[in-house]
Amino acid sequence: DFALASLKALVENHYNVVGVVTVADKPSGRGQKLHESPVKLYAESKGIPVLQPIKLKDETFVNALKALQPDLQIVVAFRMLPEVVWRLPKYGTFNLHASLLPNYRGAAPINWAIINGEKETGVTTFFIDEKIDTGAIIAQEVTPIESHETAGTLHDKLMVQGAELVLKTVDS
């Protein structure tokens, strides 16, 4: 899971992660067994509070997030946030995106880079604003796309590179 690598990096490097927001548990598979996200399972194993809102503008969720008093919010592989959420922390909210923005904004940037025959891609951290993947860029790291690369192998490379960039961004 792309987001899990960044969360693990933050925890393993002793950052004070005051909470995690992840997707709500949902039924999947033949038996429609309730599936919990890897981010939720990891956070719970580390004693980190987990919020799983259905609607991000829900007053109960927003109040619970405010109660955590985050100084900074980091978004990885999640949906677009409403302004009431991304404006909350003192130092803002930044996102990790799996492309060299402004290229490949939006969904499936890894797939599109391969489909379009790009020779390189990378990861970007940027401050969230009103539009999708348009905020001020904080940092970028480039990685080559090898001729044998698949979306899966590139995903895994960018996941590791992205977690490292999240740490560099928090430290800057």
Residue ranges and their predicted role:
Residues 1-3, 54-57, 77-80:
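Short beta->alpha connector loops
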Residues 1-31:
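N-terminal Rossmann-like dinucleotide-binding module
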Residues 4, 8-12, 62-66, 83, ...:
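Amphipathic, non-transmembrane alpha-helical secondary structure
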Residues 13, 72-172:
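Donor/substrate-binding cores of folate-linked one-carbon enzymes
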Residues 23-71:
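N-terminal glycine-/serine-/threonine-rich beta1-alpha1-beta2 phosphate-ribose binding loop
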